[in-house]
Regions:
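Mature catalytic domains of secreted/periplasmic carbohydrate-active enzymes
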Residues: 27-483
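Bacterial Sec-dependent N-terminal signal peptides
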Residues: 1-30, 483
């Protein structure tokens, strides 16, 4: 009888645990917060425009405006000495606003050649570019009819945005337009809405913003998307209903338009992700000058990483202080991003005359030389779901059976370990540059293999190994040792 009682107690305990587990799961479901202005679709967009975006791999960012005239310096002082970025120099206490706001009268980039810019990007292997139409200072690089603070009133006068769009499109590069919501030049801009007067002024500002964005989409119908910035202040976070309606309006007048997660705020002022942790945008834009370490960190969302070449600063600075990234560093970041289902976007900051720095030109040329040989491991590639190894990164060609090893660190032994995902085995391995010479593979007893490089093989830059795979009915992990 005692044994039966114990069994009954155990059975009762299990029933209780199941009941409470079910109750908790039901409660968790009920805890979803009702939102009027949260995410409107869950999961990835699968239309042709977004599929194209997903396959880009490599992009270019260009920060250019009147801040390039100062180049991060004023009266012999470097804004970078106090941690400032060149494109933010108007906010520095050393620079009088009256001085900064008159810089446009000197903006005359005689050396600006958009066709040369686009040709450099094409050689680099860039598939899309994001160009700053208006940064936080409010200066417009197109002749906007809603403000006098634009390129139309500079000595240069010509529409820079149009020239960039036309030149890059002519090279087959898709164009996205950066637009700062924050606008220091507009008297109706507010950081917060503390009074009725603030709200009235900001309502005017919201209309101004909508008008300018409408103007951009009407003027440049070939663009593929908008890249927003300056949306972190309370004034915008309290405007979730407006940002939601703006997002829907822009997509209605420009079908297929791609907008990331920086534009909107939800009912509670959350940005990027709503109160239910769902992405509010077509892709995640939280990866600024940082890259996720694991695929799990991306939450399965589309995403890209935007990266500067110097350690801080997007606009032109006369002096790059400290470390700036080498080509191999940038290539490794590119490979890491693509291996985790993301795109990688490298920023360039031309000077006031419209030319790039020698360091930027060198990086672009060297990246392009590498991409010319190895781009098949970057374009239209995705997360391979193979166990990460120390030699570098895996990418997988979308819809194919090929997996690419982008190798940055060759072990002293010259042998590279791989471990395919379950139910998959490697049929053949070879260097991308020498497909007719298979590499020797040595299978191990726990589902892994070594790929042996030829003794004579030497590499002074990252290289790619192609793995042709096939499905197998056997579990490739092999028998586990008894311990």
């Amino acid at each position: 009888m005692k044994k039966i009682r114990i069994l009954n107690k155990t059975f009762f305990t299990v029933l209780c645990l199941l009941f409470f587990s079910f109750s908790y799961s039901q409660q968790a479901k009920k805890e979803e917060i009702p939102l009027l202005h949260g995410a409107h679709h869950i999961g990835k967009r699968m239309d042709a425009d977004m599929v194209r975006w997903r396959g880009y791999g490599l992009g270019q960012f260009i920060h250019w405006g009147v801040y390039s005239i100062l180049g991060g310096d004023y009266n012999g002082k470097h804004y970078s000495d106090v941690g400032g970025a060149a494109e933010w120099i108007r906010s520095w206490k050393e620079v009088p606003h009256s001085v900064y706001d008159s810089l446009y009268k000197k903006f005359d980039p005689k050396a600006f050649n958009p066709k040369q810019w686009a040709a450099m990007a094409k050689q680099m292997g860039v598939k899309y570019v994001t160009f700053t139409t208006k940064h936080h200072d409010g200066f417009c690089m197109w002749p906007s009819k809603y403000t006098n603070y634009s390129v139309a009133n500079t000595p240069y006068k010509k529409d820079i945005v149009k020239q960039v769009v036309d030149a890059y499109n002519a090279e087959g590069i898709d164009v996205y337009l950066y637009f700062s919501i924050m606008d220091w030049h507009n008297p109706d801009w507010r950081y917060d809405l503390k009074t009725k007067e603030d709200t009235i002024a900001f309502d005017r500002f919201k209309l101004f913003t909508k008008n300018q964005l409408t103007e951009l989409l009407k003027n440049y119908p070939a663009i593929k998307g908008l890249w927003f910035d300056g949306t972190w202040d309370n004034s915008w976070k309290k405007s979730g209903a407006f940002s939601d309606s703006l997002d829907q309006y822009l997509k209605a007048i420009h079908p297929g338009l791609i907008i990331g997660s920086r534009l909107r705020a939800d009912d509670f002022g959350n940005r990027h992700f709503d109160a239910n942790h769902e992405l509010m945008g077509d892709y995640e834009q939280g990866w600024e000058r940082k890259i996720p370490k694991t695929f799990a960190e991306t939450n399965g969302n589309d995403w890209d990483c935007v990266m500067t070449i110097p350690e801080n600063g997007w606009g032109y600075a006369k002096k790059w202080l400290g470390h700036w990234k080498t080509t191999n560093e940038l290539l490794e970041m590119l490979a890491q991003c693509v291996s985790l289902d993301g795109n990688f976007v490298i920023n360039f900051g031309p000077g006031a005359d419209g030319t790039f720095r020698p360091e930027e030109i060198k990086n672009a040329k060297e990246i392009g030389d590498w991409m010319k040989v190895n781009n098949t491991a970057i374009y239209n590639c995705e997360y391979a779901a193979w166990e990460k190894q120390d030699w570098g990164y895996y990418t997988k060609k979308t819809g194919e059976n090929k997996v690419y090893m982008i190798v940055f660190n060759v072990p002293v032994s010259g042998s590279l370990k791989i471990k395919p995902s379950k139910k998959l085995e490697v049929d053949k391995a070879y260097l991308l540059t020498d497909p007719n010479k298979p590499l020797t593979m040595e299978k191990l007893d726990y589902g892994a293999s070594f790929i042996h490089l030829p003794n004579a093989f030497k590499a002074n830059k990252p290289f790619v190994i192609v793995l042709e795979t096939k499905e197998t009915n056997q579990n490739n992990e092999g028998p586990k040792a008894k311990t």
